[in-house]
């Protein structure tokens, strides 16, 4: 597997900062959970890489055991919560920071891990599969590898083969455990694939998502009528660091006036999004207008050549993705109402994080890449700390719906991620690299460093 490597910028922002801590969940002295009208004895989770605990480009046990689903099971007092455990250094090997000045992030030199409990005779309680969509949950034809994309994605196939293990569909394996509580988190990959490709991948139509989601819910109602439910909304993926890190404009070296980057259709508009995968192009001056300041690599003058369509999400494409997210969330909200399920508003939590930030013990955590504390090094997936916030969001929703009294996760266990004192002033965005230009350095990033999970 090719090493995923990139150099990053503005190292001064990171000096003195602490990185997110990882580790096993320790016992917390808290009041015992009271289940109210719910039953958490056999909790099974369905979902995508978010629920699986994918972080910084891969799966590894010390992050899988910090996923919101794992934390919820711990807090709610589930009898067990098995996961498809992955040894260090992860599958694929996780990204890491090797240098702060300049910031150097890579998985080079790391050893691929392995799935360590494939022989478990029962299905896992965490049946979330990275790359999966709601269709994959009910698909009975390609259930062990998912519908092969064109060209095939070996990581996608690897995840299905090692988590589903040819034991039946995801839904069949969930229902076969006699679940008393199920959480469902689908919809992100239906839109993330289109968004992360610059909208080069077609969106799943809202009516089709609605029909498949309804099929999933109908089967659960029929074959697991005893199960209480928590349904998770779809976050607006256009607000995550993968889409918000690079501004669509720079400044003129001669006048200091703002000038637009060059996209496939000409100058970018203020609402256009430059994807993180454009980093390698920007580093050699592509996308930077002639005479414009290269905020990624000042040593490489702008050459005026346009960025590729796959590196830019224009305002119309962003609006289409946001519309699809809204439609999916309408489906999920309606399903929660019909089923009497708890609704976990992950979309609302991300909206709060990307505007005012999330607050804990005097610190503010935000969605800024690396420095914000909420997103891992792949720019897409939550950190351990963010999973703690999500777990508490789920706990609040379940407590309110079922009259339960589940104690919150102690966020202090994960709150060593970059804190508010290291944030650039919010008013300085979206051009944090213009200041202190002598501290900037080149970026080199393979175009496939991040794909929809």
What does each model-found stretch correspond to?
Residues 1-20:
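Sec-dependent bacterial lipoprotein signal peptides
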Residues 77, 176-177, 212-230, 324-345:
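A structural motif corresponding to the C-terminal end of an alpha-helix
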Residues 43-57:
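Catalytic nucleophile-elbow at a beta strand-turn-alpha helix junction centered on a G-D-S/GDSL motif
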Residues 59-215, 238, 243, 411-452:
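Conserved SGNH/GDSL esterase-like catalytic core that processes O-acyl groups on lipids
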Residues 45, 63, 67, 71, ...:
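Extracytoplasmic/secreted proteins, especially bacterial periplasmic and envelope-associated proteins
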Residues 16-42, 405-418:
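Bacterial Sec-dependent N-terminal signal peptides
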Residues 24, 92-142, 244, 249-453:
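Conserved catalytic region of serine esterases and O-acyltransferases that act on ester linkages
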Residues 46-49, 184-189, 197, 232-236, ...:
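Active-site-proximal beta-strand/loop segments in catalytic clefts of secreted hydrolases
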